[in-house]
């Protein structure tokens, strides 16, 4: 009995230490990325500025599990969210994983897998990812994201430039200032409706996991969020977040994500 009591006490102390390391201010500050429409990654803001979407729901579940008040901190792109996690301005975020980001933040498991492709205007005859890569084609992507880094790596002939947000990218397509927009496939159907004659290309130039992230040098915090995401994938919480956001056709990431 004494041994069991000692073990339980030690486990309680370890949990308390993990929570303190993860959320030193006493509240869980979560960086989310907003856009005009929801995706498996982006949230939308209501009239009061409150975020809604997959990552907002998962963040809420994490705060509930840790018994912490929740503070959402919203950014227009994942590059700024990465900066906030790295600097300690926020405690946790969710973002696509690539080698560049792994140098800056620590990733737990992916909750979902996605792929990146292009949305092209009507005047561009390209039907596939490969056909976008032609001299004279103007491609745009969101600054400091895994998607634009992958597009830069794979494009050999087309030109590519960055914008600060999805809204700015759509405006450039409408104004004829760009021919193609690089983004996650699940995000694009809504924006195709906003740009007459536009379409989504076949194929993908990137397949990637979207994962929970914390600052480097916080092993207890990383272990805590890893356990949470693994449990959320097993108990249906991630599935529910996807379904509630309108992504019933998107699969939950397997327990051994390809990006980890």
Give residue ranges: language-model regions.
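A ligand-binding cleft/hinge motif common to bilobed small-molecule-binding domains
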Residues: 79, 95-104, 150, 174-206
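Short loop->beta-strand "edge-of-pocket" segments that line small-molecule binding or catalytic clefts
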Residues: 26-34, 52, 130-147, 159
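Acidic, polar ligand-binding/catalytic clefts
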Residues: 37, 60, 64, 69-133, ...
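Alpha-to-beta junction loops
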Residues: 28-29, 67-69, 86-95, 136-138, ...
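Short helix-initiation/N-cap motifs at beta->coil->alpha
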Residues: 56, 72-83, 127, 161-175, ...
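Extracytoplasmic small-molecule ligand-binding "clamshell" domains
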Residues: 15-96, 235, 244
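Periplasmic-binding protein-like
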Residues: 112-122, 185, 189-230, 248-260
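Extended ligand-binding regions for polar small-molecule ligands
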Residues: 19, 53-65, 124, 130-133, ...
């Amino acid at each position: 009995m004494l041994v069991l009591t000692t073990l339980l006490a030690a486990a309680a102390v370890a949990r308390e230490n993990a929570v303190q390391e993860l959320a030193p201010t006493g509240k869980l500050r979560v960086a989310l990325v907003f856009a005009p429409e929801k995706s498996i990654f982006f949230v939308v803001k209501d009239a009061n500025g409150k975020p809604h979407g997959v990552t907002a729901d998962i963040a809420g579940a994490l705060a509930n599990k840790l018994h912490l008040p929740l503070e959402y901190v919203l950014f227009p792109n994942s590059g700024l969210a990465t900066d906030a996690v790295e600097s300690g301005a926020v405690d946790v975020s969710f973002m696509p994983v690539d080698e560049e980001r792994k140098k800056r933040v620590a990733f737990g498991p992916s909750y979902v897998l996605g792929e990146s492709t292009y949305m092209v205007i009507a005047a561009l005859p390209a039907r596939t990812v490969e056909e976008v890569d032609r001299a004279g084609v103007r491609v745009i992507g969101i600054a400091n994201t895994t998607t634009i880094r992958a597009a830069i790596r794979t494009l050999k002939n087309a030109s590519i430039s960055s914008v600060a947000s999805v809204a700015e990218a759509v405006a450039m397509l409408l104004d004829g200032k760009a021919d193609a927009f690089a983004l996650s496939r699940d995000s694009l159907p809504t924006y195709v409706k906003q740009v007459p004659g536009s379409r989504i290309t076949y194929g993908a130039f990137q397949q990637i996991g979207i994962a929970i992230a914390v600052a480097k040098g916080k092993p207890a915090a990383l272990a805590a969020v890893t356990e949470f995401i693994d449990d959320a994938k097993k108990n249906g919480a991630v599935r529910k977040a996807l379904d509630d956001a309108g992504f019933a056709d998107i699969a939950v990431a397997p327990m051994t994500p390809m990006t980890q």
